[in-house]
């Protein structure tokens, strides 16, 4: 604490804000001092209507995408809050979700790198080669997801469970549900890795932002959430069965994204 008072949730919020401010300052300073690709000050202050139109055309769908996706995931907690044993269910979901985010953080790094690679290939005019590159990178991400899934299951469901669970004040029911959720997450990681790399990396890198908007949100809003409402609030299935719904999004998203990937319609030269 360094002598500072305990701020609780307020402290967590302040720390998050400060980390984002530091992140912005570091990124902006690097961009400002970069010599290989110098930041043009006049382009920031007076970008021009043509550049502004392009920016809005490709950034607006991404903004809508992230807003809808974040809102959709928040609705999962709302649904759980209206179910039996809601406190145990939400506690298990919070812990399992954080562990899964820790394990899949590398997936988003891969997706960001793929976006750069795809955009570079399209920018250099390699429109034919980028199709095979995009496919290869997506299936590489799928293979990486298999490794991550096995690691998550081995570490947190079997080997490290006796050491991790006691660190949190979970009831016996919450611990059992957390284990079930982690098993579901571990099974879904290969599809999670594939679909994230495909949507965030390949489609967005190829300028196919409208398709990525639909592919990213349709499975969540028209698949996962309605099925969760049906099973959890109407049929009132056991919580262990309800946990299987966590995999639905990726089961629906992956084949839709694979179809778009094979079509080649995601390749757009926006330079």
Feature names for model-found ranges:
Residues 77, 90-156, 193-212:
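Small-residue-rich hydrophobic transmembrane alpha-helices
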Residues 210-222, 229-237, 244:
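C-terminal structured "cap/appendage" subdomains that terminate the fold
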Residues 23, 68, 72, 110-114, ...:
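Residue-level signal for transmembrane alpha-helical positions in Major Facilitator Superfamily
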Residues 27, 72, 76, 114, ...:
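Hydrophobic/aromatic residues in alpha-helical transmembrane segments
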Residues 1-7, 67-98, 102, 120-121, ...:
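Helix-terminus/linker motif at the lipid-water interface of multi-pass membrane proteins
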Residues 2-59, 118-188, 231-271:
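Short alpha-helical transmembrane segments in multi-pass integral membrane proteins
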Residues 26-29, 44-75, 102, 106, ...:
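Hydrophobic faces of transmembrane alpha-helices in multi-pass small-molecule transporters and flippases
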């Amino acid at each position: 604490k360094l002598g500072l008072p305990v701020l609780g949730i307020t402290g967590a919020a302040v720390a998050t804000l400060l980390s984002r401010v530091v992140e912005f300052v570091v990124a902006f300073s690097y961009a400002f001092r970069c010599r290989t690709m110098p930041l043009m000050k006049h382009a920031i202050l007076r970008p021009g209507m043509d550049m502004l139109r392009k920016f809005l055309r490709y950034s607006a769908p991404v903004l809508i995408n992230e807003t809808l996706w974040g809102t959709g995931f928040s609705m999962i907690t709302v649904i759980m809050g209206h179910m039996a044993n809601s406190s145990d269910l939400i506690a298990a979901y919070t812990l399992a979700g954080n562990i899964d985010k820790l394990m899949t953080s590398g997936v988003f790094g891969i997706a960001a790198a793929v976006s750069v690679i795809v955009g570079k290939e399209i920018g250099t005019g390699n429109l034919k080669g980028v199709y095979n590159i995009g496919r290869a990178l997506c299936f590489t991400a799928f293979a990486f997801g298999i490794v991550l899934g096995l690691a998550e299951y081995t570490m947190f469901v079997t080997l490290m469970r006796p050491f991790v669970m006691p660190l949190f004040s979970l009831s016996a029911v919450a611990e059992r549900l957390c284990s079930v959720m982690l098993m579901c997450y571990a099974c879904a990681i290969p599809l999670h890795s594939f679909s994230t790399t495909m949507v965030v990396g390949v489609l967005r890198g190829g300028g196919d932002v409208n398709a990525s908007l639909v592919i990213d949100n349709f499975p969540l809003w028209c698949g996962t959430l309605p099925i969760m409402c049906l099973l959890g609030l109407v049929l009132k299935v056991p919580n262990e069965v309800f946990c299987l719904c966590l995999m639905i999004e990726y089961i629906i998203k992956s084949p839709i994204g694979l179809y778009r990937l094979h079509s080649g319609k995601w390749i757009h030269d926006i330079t």
